[in-house]
């Protein structure tokens, strides 16, 4: 069993949602740790990589056991499914960056509010459609996939390459990224 370190490099603003709002100011806030720093939840990474493995399996032969070991298998009425054998940590800023940002009180500079509104067919904004979301500026975060079976390392590396966008609005220009294996 091996731990695989990875890095997510964001090339555009990104938003992993917390499910919270800031009253009348912002409709959707970014998920943050107790120090107010952004991170990508491990379950988000796991879901994206599972989706990537599923897409990849349409082009190359991937053993179902490998997908089940890495991501688990959901159950149904006839089968209880199975849990994955690996664990995905949250992807966070590197320790040096965290310490610098916190000690210099720079957390507020990591975020931007972006406003949008719905436009009618006649080109005029719809009433009451203004929405503001908080986004994180482009940066890099790091995570670990723990307890990876040696025979699944190559599949995991291939799924990293498949992910090109992450988070809210990933089909509208937010969250453009690259995931790469470290070390």
Where do the PLM segments sit?
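Short amphipathic beta-strand starts and helix->beta connectors
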Residues: 116-132
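RNA-binding basic/glycine-rich loop and surface signature characteristic of RAMP-family CRISPR effectors
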Residues: 1-111, 128-183
């Amino acid at each position: 069993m091996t731990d695989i370190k990875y890095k997510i490099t964001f090339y555009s603003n990104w938003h992993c949602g917390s499910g919270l709002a800031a009253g009348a100011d912002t409709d959707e806030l970014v998920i943050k740790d107790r120090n107010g720093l952004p991170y990508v939840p491990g379950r988000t990474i796991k879901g994206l990589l599972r989706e990537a493995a599923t897409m990849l399996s349409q082009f190359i032969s991937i053993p179902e056991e490998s997908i089940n070991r890495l991501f688990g298998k959901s159950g149904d009425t006839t089968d209880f499914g199975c849990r994955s054998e690996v664990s995905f940590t949250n992807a966070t800023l590197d320790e040096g960056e965290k310490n610098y940002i916190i000690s210099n009180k720079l957390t507020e500079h990591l975020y931007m509010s972006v406003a949008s509104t719905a436009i009618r067919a006649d080109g005029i904004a719809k009433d009451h459609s203004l929405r503001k979301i908080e986004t994180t500026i482009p940066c890099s975060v790091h995570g670990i996939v723990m307890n990876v079976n040696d025979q699944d390392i190559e599949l995991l590396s291939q799924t990293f390459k498949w992910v090109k966008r992450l988070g809210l609005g990933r089909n509208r220009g937010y969250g453009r990224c690259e995931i790469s294996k470290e070390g």
